[in-house]
Every structure is written in structure tokens, then in C-alpha cells.
Amino acid sequence: MKPCQKMEGNLEKEDEPKPEEEPKPEEKPEEGQEPEEEEKSEETFRERLIRSLQDFQEDIHNRHLSSDDLFRDVEELDEIRKVRNKLIVTRWKANRSHPYPYLM
């Protein structure tokens, strides 16, 4: 046998896939535990959802807004809108490369 044939034979043996070692049974997670954990997390999620819904309903019933509070909120929104529009116009005046802005 020629030396080159010996080398080719060695290469062929190295290319053969080696069987992968399976993890030991201790390392494998048991399938029975996963659904229980999912159920627990689901239950806690449902409980939290129900609790938050109850808190929200209580908050809505306890919140009685007077007309003064509503008018004050509307006035604040109007003031915010005016300031926003002023800023938009000033920016537009500084940089007129785009069309006139839409104001609210």
C-alpha cells in the first residue's frame, strides 16, 4: 500500500460521524413537571388579572369628577395644544424646506 493511500484511509475514518452521546437520565428534564409549572403560572396570571380588574372597577366607582375638574383638564389640554402649535410654527419658520405644518 502506498503512503498516499494510507493517508486517504485515515481521512475517510475521520470523516465518519461519531454517534453523539445522549445526556444522562439525570440531566434530562422530566416532562411531567413542565405542565404543572405552566398551570401554576397560568393560575397566578389569572388571579392577578382578576385582582387588577376588581381594583379597576373599585377605582372607577370611587372616582367622582366634578365639572370643575373636567373644565380644568380641558383648559390644560387647550394650553398644551397652543404651546405645541407655537413650537411647530417657530420650527417651520426656522426651516422652511417643508410645507406649512398642520396645526391642531
Swiss-Prot record:
Localization per Swiss-Prot or TrEMBL: Nucleus
Biased composition (Basic and acidic residues): 9-31
Start and end residues of each stretch annotated as Disordered: 1-48
Keywords: Nucleus, Transcription, Transcription regulation
GO molecular function: WW domain binding
Highest taxon, organism lineage: Eukaryota
Role of this protein: May be involved in transcriptional regulation.
Family (UniProt): Belongs to the TFS-II family. TFA subfamily.
Protein name, entry field: Transcription elongation factor A protein-like 9
Organism: Mus musculus
